[in-house]
């Protein structure tokens, strides 16, 4: 009989030693403090400082001090998977990517999620960034996609993988690179704002540069952009309440299509339905749009 199962009946439950110390090499996951320190050392201080300012976890400072029930990157992943003509690529530990893709498909996603694997060697030498760039270049087909969202999870963020060096566009396809580490984003609600804010920033710069694609539907009335995810029937009901005021419900941010971002920016006012969208509010304010709520 195998020695793996003792025959004397003295079995003890398996336990993981949580105080064994963080693994400092090989791309392994570590404690939040260790990962945060590594990310700052790798040049990500500006991003972490912005997240800390946008999403303070002090309960007295705002609504972001919530128990984290799952990887926050699920929020941004779900937003990307719901958008038309948008591809999503993840860079992170295989176990993290598996959990995120499993959860996203459990919630009804019917899109393929791109994944760029790494090893300790590719992480340390910088080859991971080259692999990401090669993958995005192969995926960037303007016939199929308006945008490609590339997301760094914990380990690539802590290692300083510079998604900003991918550029703004490849083959005419917009590239949105974001860092969504579990040690910097409180919950998946804030991660939705990270992506929505990044896309609004890109779209706002496009509008400033020249003509952009018209929305599929346009109201003759001034519109109210609705900031925060909601059920499909909610904008209809809100629109009925706005009609007597001479207003119409505009796009819901996060949007379902890239061109809706332009319509969202072209509004009379923004109604902040949810309290988590700090980065998005910053972009609307930069566009000169008043915020209510």
Annotate the PLM regions.
Residues 1-293:
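An N-terminal assembly and electron-transfer interface module characteristic of large anaerobic redox
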